[in-house]
Amino acid sequence: MKSDVKLFCLVGLPASGKSTYAKELSEQYNAKIHSSDALREELFGDVNAVSKENNDILFTELYKRVKKDLRNGNNVVYDATNVNKRNRLAFLKFISGVECEKICVLVALPYHLCLTRNLQREKSVPADVIERMYKHFQPPNEKEGWDSFSIYVNCEESDIFAYSTSVLFNNASGIDYFHQESQHHRDTLGLHSRKVADLMYEAKKELEYTALIHDVGKIFTKTRTNSHGVEDGDCHYYGHNCVGAYESLFYFLNDTDYEADAIIYHMNLIYYHMVPYNDGWNDTESKIRRLKAQLGEELYEDVVLLNRCDREAHEE
């Protein structure tokens, strides 16, 4: 039996408009707002008072307040960035004994607009903090424990008009001209992406579009230094799956008619597509079972399929 008590957990980058939307939800559902920014200012006197010690104190108290209100039968809006999977799981575990409908709300605003709007705020966040969250973004998924998903698009249609494969490929600065400069990739990013999409069309055509944009994060993560900070003659794309998952959100919104659940599913497919490149990822049955439990059977199979198409495209 579904509980009448609703929990709205917002997920979004700083300056994406979470707090504004939290107020709308609060009015619509007569919900209590619990904001990490507001509590940080209450406890430490500064929204930018960020440290591990402060965060431990902050989120322990925040979780307690959310849980108390839910137990008292109040609808709650939990307003924090929540872009990290581990933090979302810790929160859900903390409130696991409370009956409520858990709704995960992805607040969508392109990264460059987050940076612009951040500068217009009275209390801004350091730009490097937003960049770090963007480059480590982890999309939520059903197996975390959510009952439903929704997406709140906090911009005009014109703001995401350029998020289309017709623009991504077919202009002078598009990915057809993006040279990957890596020993692992001799093709341009555009050609490689088309090859993966063609292979996916033959294997599972409903994933063709996702295959076409699976590496879109590489545009924003290209670096000539390796993980040790040394130039080694190759370009590297650390975290391109995280950035790609975030950027893909706007391509799906603009180019497809997918509902929120489907968009988030495909974002996860892009986020996880690199897992099978990790050494030993499937060398024991227990590792495979853990990953299937984390993703679900269907997403697991689709991740393996996308990775297979990605590998085969390298070999063509």
Q: Model-derived features: where do they sit?
A:
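Divalent metal-dependent catalytic cores for phosphoryl transfer on phosphate-bearing substrates
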Residues: 196-314
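Conserved glycine(s) of the Walker
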Residues: 17
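Acidic/His-rich, divalent-metal-binding segments that scaffold phosphate/diphosphate chemistry
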Residues: 152-233
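The conserved Walker
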Residues: 13-14
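Conserved substrate/cofactor phosphate-moiety recognition/catalytic segment
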Residues: 20-74
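Glycine-rich phosphate-binding loop used to anchor ATP phosphates in small-molecule kinases
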Residues: 54-102
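Hydrophobic anchor at the beta1->P-loop junction of P-loop NTPases
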Residues: 10
